[in-house]
Amino acid sequence: METKLMSFRDTIILAMSEEMRRDENVLLMGEDVGVFGGDFGTSVGMLEEFGPERVRDCPISEAAISGAAAGAAMTGLCPIVDMTFMDFSVIAMDNIVNQAAKTRYMFGGKGQVPITIRCAAGNGVGSAAQHSQSLESWFTHIPGLKVVAPGTPADMKGLLKSSIRDNNPVIILEYKSEFNQKGEVPVDPDYTIPLGVGEIKREGTDVTVVTYGKMLRRVMQAAEELAEEGISVEVVDPRTLVPLDKEIIINSVKKTGKVVLVNDAHKTSGFIGEISAIISESEAFDYLDAPIRRCAGEDVPMPYAQNLENAMIPTVESIKEAIRKTHNKQ
């Protein structure tokens, strides 16, 4: 498969542009998506190609944007919403949770709401407490929503395109600190990744680490460094949180007998707690040789100071230490 080295940012532009060329019903809407090219540069050049009818600059009202998008989706269009910071999605919760997520069910499966809501999540760029949250577990709790958290540029392309083509509302996380990170991306305009299919990012035999999104790069580095210590780490990336590929997680835990769960979101009620419950309630529980361990963000608001911000979420070193303790059955 032919690939090209691309950043997350350029991959997002490519995936949206390919889908807008494929389907004239697809449009992009949000604050500053047109003339400015997106707050994070994720729609640069799209206004020039597709025009203001399909790349729509909107007023600063997330409630209005999400409501207009939900209505457009219900009447045959396929809107992509740039919510900019994920923190701002809370202003749009009624339209996302009570309208978009419930419509198909309340109309007996006859109503479709093909809306993709792109959210810039996580810390790492000095955006402080109101612009640095990872709120995926808020949305995984809501039946009717799909939630996607790509950890590589290739996965971003395949999963974003599948999200746009899906006839249900999808929340997709784009981690701000990763926009400039690069990886090989398939150039095929028909390249997609099915929602609900995870991937083993690294084979191992001693400890399973389940992670997604922003933390994948750090976990992969930790696994590589621990290999020099003789610890073989298997890295499982579910890629999609809802629907979740439970089988790939359970099978890996059965293989290694030990598991560490890593995310950057706050530890309390974070999504990795749900993964822990799934493992505990499955046949994998009988294979465990050590307690399930979580490595997650601290339960405090995100500081602005860089040194404090860096201390807020798992580092390569803290991930390595969690894996070591689990490997040693501590």
Give the predicted meaning of each segment.
Residues M1-P169, L173, K176-Q330:
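Thiamine diphosphate
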